[in-house]
């Protein structure tokens, strides 16, 4: 069970143009999707101008039939428009190089990225290993076997799990999990297990940090734990609108919501801008730093500074050997050999920053339930509460490990 295509250190390179928008390449090691692009508009473009641009693209596309290389099947053209808050407007589509060149020369376009493959971030699997992460979250010292917590914490809060789905019928969720939206296939189930494991750590009755939180499945990764960057952004857009009162943005609704993204890929300015729009809407988001033992600045959405980026620790309070690190990491959380939910009323033990991030998402829900203010500022609260525990956290990286403030 894996996460991410290895987020190799990549610097996005501008391929063109002098007068038009930059067309960004994710480098030779990124797994790009042929002819698929994400087009990001300038921040000051109005909704009316965005709609006019979409009409222009449609008219231009219809006048010039495009076919995929080696196939008689036509290209799709514009496929989905994104609008996250007032700051991020974009669309995804399938175009040939000539059409993309024309789009890049449009005055309203900021930049264009090739769409890339994104994967989940668990990296190892081991059966029947006792979990230690919960005890560590509720204690100032390592080595405990009891989780100390307030049993009302998390109630009234909703956690959106942007992942492979959730087995909503698993007994550990106690009826608090529901299906949200599927952006990757036609199976409204977790056929991979990654998302259910993550959700269990956020809010399972036995395995969860916030045992009263409501959980919503937002499926963006398939049975192999793989999806597209554009599909992930679709899930982010839907979750943001739901968290903000069904599209009618309200700070009160947003402040009672948290999100978890235990996934990622090579650095993507489009993904980072979408994540920032969610933070700007007043929603707390925890994301996995990545599992490549390198600087997380090269991964997205982990490299976006306005969200809470989580590295993984081991049971002895050392940095997990696979965990990414660097200045963009906000906090460490347990991520090595973590036991949680498996579809079919089972359990599984996994390792990865995928397992660390939901500890922080769950703690965010826990603290909101206790009356702490939600939104991106909650990451600062979590850092202030944390203990200086991590040994050798990595160059330029915080040594802070999450703690729920139980007093134990």
From Swiss-Prot:
One of its GO terms (molecular function) is serine-type endopeptidase activity. Its main location: secreted. GO terms for biological process: proteolysis. One of its GO terms (cellular component) is extracellular region. Residues 131-408 form the Peptidase S8 domain. Keywords: Glycoprotein, Hydrolase, Protease, Secreted, Serine protease, Signal, Virulence, Zymogen. It is an enzyme of class 3 (hydrolase). It is found in: Secreted. Residues 21-123 form a propeptide. Its EC number is 3.4.21.-. Residues 1-20 form the signal peptide. SUPFAM superfamilies: Protease propeptides/inhibitors (SSF54897), Subtilisin-like (SSF52743). The keyword Secreted applies. InterPro entries: PCSK9_ProteinaseK-like, Peptidase_S8/S53_dom, Peptidase_S8/S53_dom_sf, Peptidase_S8_Asp-AS, Peptidase_S8_His-AS, Peptidase_S8_Ser-AS, Peptidase_S8_subtilisin-like, Peptidase_S8_subtilisin-rel. Glycans are attached at residues 248, 260, 345, 404. Residues 36-119 form the Inhibitor I9 domain. Secreted subtilisin-like serine protease with keratinolytic activity that contributes to pathogenicity. Belongs to the peptidase S8 family. This is Subtilisin-like protease 6. It comes from Arthroderma gypseum (strain ATCC MYA-4604 / CBS 118893).
């Amino acid at each position: 069970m894996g996460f991410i295509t290895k987020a190799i250190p990549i610097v996005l390179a501008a391929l063109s143009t002098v007068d038009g928008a930059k067309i960004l390449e994710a480098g030779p090691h990124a797994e790009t999707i042929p002819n698929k692009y994400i087009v990001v508009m300038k921040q000051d473009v109005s909704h009316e101008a965005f709609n006019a641009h979409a009409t222009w693209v449609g008219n231009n596309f219809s006048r010039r039939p495009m076919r995929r290389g080696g196939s008689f099947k036509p290209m799709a053209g514009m496929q989905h428009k994104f609008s996250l808050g007032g700051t991020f407007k974009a669309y995804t589509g399938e175009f040939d190089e000539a059409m993309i060149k024309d789009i890049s020369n449009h005055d309203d376009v900021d930049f264009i990225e090739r769409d890339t493959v994104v994967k989940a971030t668990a990296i190892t699997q081991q059966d029947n290993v006792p979990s230690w992460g919960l005890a560590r979250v509720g204690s100032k010292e390592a080595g405990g076997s009891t989780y100390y917590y307030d049993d009302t914490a998390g109630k009234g809060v909703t956690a959106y799990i942007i992942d492979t789905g959730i087995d909503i019928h698993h007994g550990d969720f106690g009826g608090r999990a529901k299906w949200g939206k599927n952006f990757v296939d036609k199976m409204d189930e977790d056929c991979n297990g990654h998302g259910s494991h993550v959700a269990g750590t956020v809010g399972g009755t036995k395995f969860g940090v916030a045992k009263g939180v409501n959980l919503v499945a937002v499926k963006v990764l398939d049975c192999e734990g793989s999806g597209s960057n554009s599909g992930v952004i679709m899930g982010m857009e839907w979750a943001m609108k739901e968290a903000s009162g069904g599209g009618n943005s309200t700070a009160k609704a947003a402040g009672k919501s948290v999100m978890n993204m235990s996934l990622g890929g090579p650095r993507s300015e489009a993904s980072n801008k979408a994540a920032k729009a969610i933070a700007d809407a007043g929603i707390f988001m925890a994301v996995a730093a990545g599992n490549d033992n390198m600087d997380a600045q090269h991964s997205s959405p982990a490299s976006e500074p306005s969200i809470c980026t989580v590295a993984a620790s081991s049971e002895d309070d050392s940095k997990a050997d696979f965990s990414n690190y660097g200045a963009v990491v906000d906090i460490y959380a347990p991520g090595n050999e973590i036991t949680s939910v498996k579809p079919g009323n089972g359990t599984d033990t996994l390792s990865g920053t995928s397992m660390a991030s939901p500890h922080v998402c769950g703690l965010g829900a826990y603290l909101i339930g206790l009356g702490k203010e939600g939104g991106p500022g909650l990451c600062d609260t979590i850092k202030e509460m944390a203990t200086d525990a991590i040994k050798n956290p990595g160059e330029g990286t915080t040594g802070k490990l999450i703690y729920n403030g139980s007093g134990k």
